[in-house]
Structures are given as structure tokens and as C-alpha cells.
């Protein structure tokens, strides 16, 4: 078995205004990040098919691992009506004064599973944009680029 990963490398300035706004809203969402332990501040924006954009940021807790990642905060908050309003894209932004932010800012395995589950529930892919604040934005057509085998429960 072989799995090929395809991630597009895009210029932030070449994106249409709506895509750029989604990505910049992920940066804005980072403003509410609470990360006193890792000092790794993450924001996520979630675009729905009706144009609504939900946002979330990582929230750490002194009782590890009780915090939540930005992607899950944004997705859980904004995915209440998936059957009528699918998630079509998410954007992730991070910054840190303590650590180097990866250029390809792949969500953690837990977040990948949540994104994958939402894709299965709504029967459509979710495009993932990843931005470190520089000139380049990375884009994956859906979460299967990072999580080729997801956990799924199917009723008998």
C-alpha cells in the first residue's frame, strides 16, 4: 500500500479576498488563545457553506491534558447544524516567542480525527489551510492528506 500526500503551496497575496479573510481570521482568533504553559498560540477559523465563519483558539489548563486545541474549539462550537450548514474549509494559524512554528502547521492527531469525523458526518471534504504568518500558505484538499486511516464506528 502506498499513500501520496498532496499539499499546495500558495502565496498569501495570490489568494482571493474571501480565502485571505478566512486565513486572517484564524490569526485574529489566536488573540484569545490561553497558552501560559506551552507559549504556543493557535487560532482556527471555520468556514461554513452559508458563509458563516466560526473561530476558536487553544485553551490550556494546569491539569494536563484538560486543555483543548484551537481546531477542536472552533469545530465543536461551529458545527452544531452540520446537516444544514456543512464545514467547507478551516484555516489554522500559530505563533510563539518560545518555539519555531512549523511551516506546514498540521493539526495534532486528535484534531485530525475530529475533522475526519465531521467530513464523514457531512459526507464532504474539508479543505485545510495552514499559515505561520509568512508569505506562504499551505493547503490540503482534505484531512485524508494527513490521516489516511481514521477511526470510524459503523452500525451493524
Per-range role (PLM):
Residues 39-48, 129:
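Short beta-strand scaffold segments in enzyme catalytic cores
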Amino acid at each position: 500500500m502506498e499513500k501520496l500526500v498532496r499539499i499546495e503551496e500558495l502565496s498569501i497575496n495570490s489568494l482571493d479576498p474571501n480565502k485571505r479573510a478566512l486565513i486572517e481570521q484564524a490569526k485574529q482568533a489566536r488573540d484569545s488563545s490561553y497558552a501560559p504553559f506551552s507559549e504556543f498560540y493557535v487560532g482556527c477559523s471555520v468556514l461554513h457553506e452559508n458563509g458563516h465563519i466560526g473561530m476558536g483558539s487553544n485553551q490550556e489548563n494546569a491539569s494536563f491534558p484538560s486543555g483543548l486545541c484551537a481546531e477542536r474549539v472552533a469545530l465543536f462550537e461551529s458545527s452544531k447544524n452540520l446537516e444544514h450548514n456543512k464545514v467547507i474549509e478551516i484555516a489554522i494559524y500559530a505563533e510563539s516567542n518560545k518555539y519555531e512554528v512549523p511551516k506546514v502547521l498540521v493539526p495534532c492527531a486528535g484534531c485530525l480525527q475530529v475533522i475526519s469525523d465531521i467530513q464523514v458526518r457531512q459526507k464532504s471534504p474539508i479543505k485545510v489551510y495552514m499559515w505561520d504568518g509568512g508569505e506562504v500558505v499551505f493547503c490540503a484538499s482534505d484531512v485524508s492528506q494527513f490521516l489516511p486511516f481514521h477511526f470510524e464506528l459503523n452500525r451493524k
